[in-house]
Amino acid sequence: MRGSGTLRGVNEPAIRLTGLRKSFGALTAVDGVDLSIRPGEVVALLGPNGAGKSTTIDLALGLARPTAGSAELFGAAPRVAIREGRVGAMLQGGALLPTLTVAESVALVAAAHRNPLTVTEALERARCTEIARQRVSKLSGGQLQRARFAVAVVSDPDLLFLDEPTAAMDVEARRTFWRSMREFTEAGRTVVFATHYLDEADEHADRIVMMARGRIVADGTPAEVKAVVSGRRIRATARFAATPESQAALAALPGVRTADRRGDRVTLVSDDSDATLRALLAEHDIHDLHDIEVTVHTMDEAFLALTETRATEGALS
């Protein structure tokens, strides 16, 4: 990485997106995104397919023209930072020439930069040494992703964008990739990676920016994002009649955020499960409730709660 004292825009955010919007006809893919990322942060863009993650990365890189708003990298237009070799990218559609070997592909990109890593260094960083002589056309999906990573880091960038970097990788390949990534970020580089793997965002990001329907619906540390959907889920089989009055009584129990009944199955989401259970058992005879269970939210449930509920709330506000 270049000496930070000589870098243009050293006091600027690594990424600044302001009022960013991108529409394709009637479809709005990115809807008013404001985002500032400091140098040295490792940030996960988390969201379901169609959330706007890839389009946001394209806009940040200057690969697409925004309908409204602006994108800056290190205080300058994206093309400036890219031309200076300060930005690397590993994109889903990043094509490599099928007739070249992995080493030749890395060398081709290295030749376009002023102060690249050596080809050997880039291959080692991406754990590609053993496939260096293989042609791109012969690579498996996971190997191809590693080759793309080698190409992305050969410029020795200060900022790296990764779009679904572990797609097509098996579990062991994913572990190997993230070991490489930890080595890359140890020098204080900035990394932004888009993913739908909840465990990757939780384990490897300093900060999670969650998107849904083109909007940011949560932004914070992994712990802060998960805390937004804190609480427990209480399920029970109910023998008492399902009436509007009984439903209202369930919803009014202390700590309850949502109350749902389908047939004889009652599901409550509570911020204080102990208080909810005490009140529930006080209001109903023990014989009216069976198969009571209390569970914590799974990460999948947290993800769904934020990407569905928050996006809807944002659209209505």
Language model feature labels by segment:
Residues D156:
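Conserved catalytic motifs of ABC-family nucleotide-binding domains
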Residues W178-S270:
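ABC transporter nucleotide-binding domain
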Residues L160-E164:
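Catalytic Walker B motif of ABC-type/P-loop ATPase nucleotide-binding domains
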Residues G231-R310, S317:
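Short, charged/small-residue-rich alpha-helical element at the C-terminal edge
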Residues G69-R83:
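Conserved ABC transporter NBD signature motif
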Residues A107, A111, P116-I131:
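Conserved ABC ATPase "signature" region
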